[in-house]
Amino acid sequence: RAYPGLVNVPRHWVRCNPQGTQIAFLMRDDNGIVQLWLISPQGGEPRQLTHNKTDIQSAFNWHPSGEWLGFVLDNRIACAHAQSGEVEYLTENHANPPSADAVVFSPDGQWLAWMEGGQLWITETDR
């Protein structure tokens, strides 16, 4: 089924969680703001996960546990809880905004990496 409002900027891929039970994607909400949405691989209606006041600015990735999704929001690295949609920031604002390329979790989920100002950055996730 086609959904109006699907976005391809920032660069975007549909991503399935590690358990294979949810597919995440970026789509505009009723206010035109780019949000994370989830849908079952079996189909059904998509569920809006995030309710941010500003656009998600990057591609995203699933935490290895499937409990979090990482992305750039408000020029900061953020994670959204995969059930509640609650967003937590992992970084403060930097001089250069993070790249719109996907943030990447380490295999154990304890670290998150991203590009910013032509350099590789990492932070602990506490997850």
Please report, for each region that a protein language model flagged, where it lies by residue.
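Predominantly a core beta-strand signature of beta-propeller blades
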Residues: 1, 44-48, 85-89, 122
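A short, compositionally biased micro-patch
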Residues: 29, 41-42, 72, 82-83, ...
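Conserved beta-propeller blade repeats
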Residues: 4-26, 48-72, 95-115
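Blade-level signature of beta-propeller repeat domains, shared across WD40, Kelch, NHL, RCC1
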Residues: 110-127
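Short loop/turn segments that connect beta-strands within beta-propeller blades
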Residues: 40-44, 81-85, 125-127
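Short glycine/acidic-enriched loop and turn motifs that connect beta-strands
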Residues: 29-32, 76-77, 119-121
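Short secondary-structure junction motifs
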Residues: 33-36, 57
